[in-house]
């Protein structure tokens, strides 16, 4: 949400969304971030709205955008091209590294094998996918939860299918069709573009091949209608969860699918990877710039490991188990009354969206209450370890337009002495700090705090009403120099 805005990507992102989606109409019929869960067939009588992330838009400075991966990659490449301190080596492979107490040496080679290079750096971050070579060479082990399900993934073109779905779900972008024979595993499909392209995945036989899978039959059955399709792509993947024991080994870090992998259920994956980068980047920058330490770097694993574990257990895995239990216990052909009663009870679509709130409340570098994870309750109150909710100031600006690139301390505008104390403490610790003194507008009052320290990733390190809190202690805690503020 706010990440593109705060990292110089906002205008590019919006331009791409506008040009590629609205003007070019590449995803004309997508209604933002809305989904539907159906029973039996998509066009059957049983369905409800599902995972509409717009329900929590008011708690963020920017609304959710469903951006196709190829456009997201375009935005990222466009931004990298603007950064003079970044080089991208296309057509090169990472082959190995060696590290010592002072630095790390990374070896790469041209795909043609003609040339090799060696880079010496302070740190290496492996973002090289679920079968990460960086993770393997670092000796970082991972735990696997094998569901032993072979999944087909296909991309198809079908104007007929699009027309059928648009008659009933023109403002919906992705669909989950439950079927009693699949024991809780999904028939999942979503729009790719306005050219009537769709992706679709579901469980198939373990020995299934491109030739044996009848994609047209499977889609016709899932939708509940007959139509023709043209297959653009077909492939297979194994449904499993994988989680690295640690996201760090010396000077090596891992992020994204290299650190954690899960079935593509619920749209959590790419956002998890972005948040890994967001969490790690400022800590690496702090270390390279001399005001971070090893304890601060260790909190990357402590914070992000807990969030993925919770996302897996409380959301993705739970959805599979809950769906399996529902399908085993209820069937409209067996008992329509009981089925419809249970189906209506399930149709509380806001619950999951409202409860998904990654946080670092248990981190050693925030003054939080509780433990870190992915379960919370969206609210405007400023709470340590949680994301800062937006607020419009009296002059009409949003607080997110004023936050610094590093730490930002937000104070009541009457707290002049505290502002001076904070600047002095930051100077002595060599911490880049922006101090904002704001008046108590209607939305600022919703924070219920007069002292808020916001981290570079827009999570709150400290929030409270205590004017006597030591600014020095708050800052040292936030960078891992001391334990929590009392």
Give, region by region, the residue ranges found by the protein language model.
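Core Rossmann-like FAD-binding/catalytic domain of the broad FAD-dependent monooxygenase superfamily
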Residues: 1, 6, 10-338
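Helical substrate-recognition/capping region of FAD-dependent monooxygenase/halogenase enzymes
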Residues: 26-60, 68, 74, 78-85, ...
């Amino acid at each position: 949400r706010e990440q593109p805005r705060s990292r110089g990507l906002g205008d590019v992102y919006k331009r791409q969304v506008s040009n590629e989606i609205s003007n070019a109409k590449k995803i004309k019929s997508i209604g933002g971030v809305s989904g539907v869960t159906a029973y039996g067939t998509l066009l059957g009588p049983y369905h409800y709205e599902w995972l509409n992330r717009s329900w929590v838009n008011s708690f963020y400075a920017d609304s959710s955008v469903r951006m196709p991966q190829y456009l997201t990659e375009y935005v990222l490449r466009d931004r990298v091209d603007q950064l003079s301190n970044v080089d991208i080596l296309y057509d090169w492979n990472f082959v190995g590294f060696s590290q010592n107490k002072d630095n790390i040496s990374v070896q790469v080679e041209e795909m043609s094998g003609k040339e090799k290079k060696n880079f010496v750096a302070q740190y290496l971050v492996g973002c090289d996918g679920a079968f990460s070579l960086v993770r393997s060479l670092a000796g970082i082990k991972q735990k696997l939860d094998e569901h032993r399900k072979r999944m087909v993934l296909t991309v198809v073109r079908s104007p007929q299918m699009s027309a059928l779905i648009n008659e009933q779900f023109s403002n919906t972008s992705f669909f989950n069709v439950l079927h009693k024979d699949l024991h809780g595993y999904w028939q999942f499909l979503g729009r790719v573009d306005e050219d009537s392209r769709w992706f679709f995945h579901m469980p198939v036989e373990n020995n299934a091949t491109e030739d044996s899978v009848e994609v047209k039959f499977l889609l016709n059955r899932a939708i509940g209608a007959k139509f023709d399709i043209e297959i653009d792509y077909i492939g297979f993947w194994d449904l499993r969860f994988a989680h690295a024991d640690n996201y760090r080994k010396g000077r090596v870090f891992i992020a994204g699918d290299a650190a954690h992998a899960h079935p593509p259920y619920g749209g959590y994956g790419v956002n998890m990877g972005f948040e890994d980068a967001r969490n790690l980047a400022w800590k690496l920058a702090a270390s390279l710039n001399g005001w971070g330490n090893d304890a601060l770097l260790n909190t990357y694993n402590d914070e992000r490991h807990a969030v993925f574990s919770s996302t897996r257990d409380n959301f993705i895995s739970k959805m599979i188990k809950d769906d399996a239990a529902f399908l085993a216990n209820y069937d409209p052909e067996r008992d329509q009354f009981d089925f419809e009663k249970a189906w209506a009870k399930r149709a509380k679509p806001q619950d999951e969206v409202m409860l998904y709130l990654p946080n670092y409340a248990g981190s050693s570098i925030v003054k939080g209450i509780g433990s870190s994870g992915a379960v919370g309750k969206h609210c405007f109150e400023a709470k340590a370890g949680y994301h800062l909710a937006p607020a419009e100031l009296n002059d009409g600006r949003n607080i997110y337009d004023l936050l610094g690139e590093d730490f930002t301390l937000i104070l009541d505008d009457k707290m002049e002495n505290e502002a001076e104390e904070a600047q002095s403490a930051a100077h002595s610790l060599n911490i880049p700090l922006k101090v904002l003194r704001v008046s108590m507008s209607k939305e600022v009052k919703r924070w219920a705090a007069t002292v808020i320290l916001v981290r570079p990733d827009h999570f709150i390190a400290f929030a409270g009403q205590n004017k006597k809190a030591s600014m020095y202690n708050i800052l040292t805690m936030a960078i891992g120099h001391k334990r929590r503020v009392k």
